[in-house]
A protein has these predicted regions:
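Extracellular/periplasmic carbohydrate-active domains that bind, remodel
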Residues: 1-238
Length: 238
């Protein structure tokens, strides 16, 4: 009674489970996931860490890639993106972590969302987190965490994080007042968190933290953001 919020009786698409491919990080990689998407299946990523050797490619209208337990997609060592989309409308990417690798310096992104997009059936990226840093090496890098070139895309709870702290190396002493390694320029390098070139892109919950240059570059027209968190790097020289 007197509920305020999303209409739970709105039209929806019911996907039978025989139309779903469940990917297991211990047995499946980008090749199997891309084969399933090309065959018209939607993809559920079981909890785990997927060490990708190629990009996951989404191009079919209505295609869905959804993680369980925040499945982690580790970027290919070649510098290719974790996910590349040619937005044909109605596509969904949800509940995944995109993780940077040690890659050559260059024009690398963790996610490239291109294509035309659809005003009548917008694609949605929900609960998508990206990180440059965290576990392991301080030499991971990316040029940009997320690029959205398609129009009419909806971003729902996006967190794009360059590490500010990391685990101490064996024998390393923290700075006074710190318990962890404080990340400095040249470590966990990433220029920008989000670049938007598409028009009519809407973000509901956008957090971008600690990038080396502009946190967000928004060149598309009529963009909207509802809640934006911006954390600058600790070093003012950045």
């Amino acid at each position: 009674k007197d509920v305020v919020g999303a209409a739970l009786d709105a039209p929806y698409r019911d996907v039978p489970f025989e139309s779903v491919f469940v990917a297991d990080a211990s047995r499946h990689g980008a090749h199997e996931i891309n084969e399933a998407l090309r065959a018209g299946l939607d993809v559920v990523l079981a909890p785990g860490v997927f060490e990708l050797d190629d990009s996951i490619r989404m191009a079919r209208p209505g295609a869905v890639v959804m993680g369980l337990g925040y499945a982690t997609l580790v970027a290919p060592a070649s510098g290719a993106a974790c996910v590349i989309a040619d937005d044909a409308g109605g596509m969904r990417l949800a509940s995944v972590v995109l993780q940077a690798s040690e890659v050559p310096a260059g024009d690398s992104s963790l996610l490239r969302w291109g294509g035309d997009g659809s005003a009548s059936d917008p694609s949605v990226l929900s609960d998508v987190f990206a990180r440059v840093g965290g576990p392991g090496s301080l030499n991971v890098r990316a040029n940009v965490m997320m690029e959205v070139a398609a129009s009419n895309v909806i971003l729902d709870n996006i967190w794009l994080w360059r590490a500010d702290h990391a685990e101490l190396a064996p024998g390393e002493q923290p700075r006074p007042g710190e318990q962890y390694h404080l990340v400095v320029p040249g470590e966990c390098s990433v220029k920008n968190g989000l670049i938007v070139d598409g028009d009519d892109v809407t973000a509901y919950g956008l957090a971008v933290e600690h990038t080396d240059q502009d946190q967000v570059i928004w060149r598309g027209e009529r963009g909207r953001t509802y809640f934006y968190q911006c954390e600058l790097p600790y070093d003012v020289n950045q």
